[in-house]
Amino acid sequence: MPRIKVFTRRQFAASAVSIAALAALPARSMANTSTQATGGNQMTTLTPYLLFDGNCHQAMEFYKSCFGGELTSMKVKDSPAKDHMPAVQQEKTINARLKSGSVEISASDWLRLDRPRIPGNTACLYLSGGTPQELKALFEKLSEEAEVHDPLKETFFGIYGALNDKFGVRWMFQAAKNS
């Protein structure tokens, strides 16, 4: 069974309220950085992931001014995906991560031209880290009666997939590539 970082109801609610009231990646890679070592094992973490309409960088800078911490961010034009994205998307943020103590927020600009950005699909639960096998097992369990948007597959930044579960909750999954 995979190890999942669990927040108390109070911690999760405080994070959600803070984010609502206010409105992760190294520069060279989109590899998972939220994996924590636990006795030689990797732990899967659960992080809020916010999607913005072209102002992700400004929003994350604002959150940094509130929470402090370290902000890492990458634009489409600086990523390996640049050749696969239209010119209109090049200045948008493909991924950002703010880490300040126990507060972690991941985000990007809305990059799906094939799906509209509407209230309800601009935030999701982001499972990252662990092993690809653990992530696959969780993806399969949550896929029951789900709407799968992106099947789990290898990408330039690791294993990735996304779905809306049978209750309408949006989930994103990411693990580092196998070495």
Which residues are covered by each model-predicted region?
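Twin-arginine (Tat) signal peptide motif
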Residues: 4-13, 27-32
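Short beta->alpha transition motifs characteristic of CBS
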Residues: 154, 173-179
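C-terminal segment of N-terminal export signals and the immediately downstream linker at the start
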Residues: 27-44
